Regions:
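Short hydrophobic beta-strand element within catalytic cores of glycosyltransferases
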Residues: 129-132
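Carbohydrate-associated surface elements
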Residues: 8
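Short alpha-helical donor nucleotide-sugar binding micro-motif in glycosyltransferases
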Residues: 91-92, 99-104
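Nucleotide-activated donor-binding/catalytic signature segment of Leloir-type glycosyltransferases, i.e.
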Residues: 74-92
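Conserved acidic donor-binding segment of nucleotide-sugar-dependent glycosyltransferases
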Residues: 145-154, 162-167
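Aromatic "clamp/platform" in nucleotide-sugar-dependent glycosyltransferases that forms part
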Residues: 112
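A charged, aromatic-enriched C-terminal amphipathic alpha-helix characteristic of glycosyltransferases
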Residues: 168-192
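Conserved donor-binding/catalytic core segment of Leloir-type glycosyltransferases
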Residues: 22-49, 174
């Protein structure tokens, strides 16, 4: 019998569990973290952010990572008049990645092509609700996320806005998403 074995995550170390989650009651943080390349769909994240900021200005956007589209994304944010709400901290690794997840209210992975994509699982482990593209492989095993087509910037913007303004939805996906990902371990995948 043949079956697909999806990726999983290791339980968070105590060091990463102990990273504090800041209070963002006044201002929300929405994050893209990954390679800033065409495959990852960063332009859709910037365009969705532009739509969100037409409805609410108490939201900041972070595009963490590096890649050949970095300069173009900085320019696109400036062209859309949202550069003051955008941060580009560059490449992250190790503990920095988990600090970014814990400091975020929403994680967005708008990938055009993504065989799996482990980042949403890592974000959800940290209690950060995630929005993923329907075209990502991890969407096959994740239910406690919001899924949109990568090209549908209006649906992505609506999802971001909803998570930033609806505490009940945020709390549900925060708690249930963490439970779901905590059950996707390498041990359980190996027992299949």
């Amino acid at each position: 019998k043949v079956f697909a074995m999806h990726n999983a995550v290791y339980p968070l170390s105590q060091e990463y569990q102990d990273i504090p989650r800041p209070d963002h009651s006044k201002e929300k943080i929405v994050t893209f973290l990954g390679r800033i390349t065409m495959q990852k769909g960063p332009e859709y994240f910037v365009e969705a952010a532009s739509l969100v900021l037409q409805r609410a200005r108490n939201i900041r956007f972070v595009m963490a990572g590096s890649g050949d589209m970095m300069d173009a994304m900085i320019n696109l944010a400036a062209e859309r008049g949202i550069a003051d709400r955008f941060h580009f901290p560059g490449f992250m690794k190790g503990k920095q990645v988990y600090e970014v997840y814990k400091n975020s209210d929403v994680f967005v992975m708008p990938s055009v092509s993504e065989p799996f994509g482990i980042a949403p699982l890592e974000a959800m482990q940290c209690g950060t609700p995630s929005i993923i593209s329907k075209q990502s492989g991890c969407g096959e095993i994740l239910d406690k996320v919001i899924k949109t087509d990568y090209w549908d910037i209006h649906a992505m913007a609506d999802a971001i806005y909803s998570l930033c303004t609806n505490p009940a939805l945020f709390q549900y996906l925060q708690e249930e998403g963490k439970k779901e990902v905590d059950g996707i371990t390498w041990e359980k995948v190996g027992l299949r």
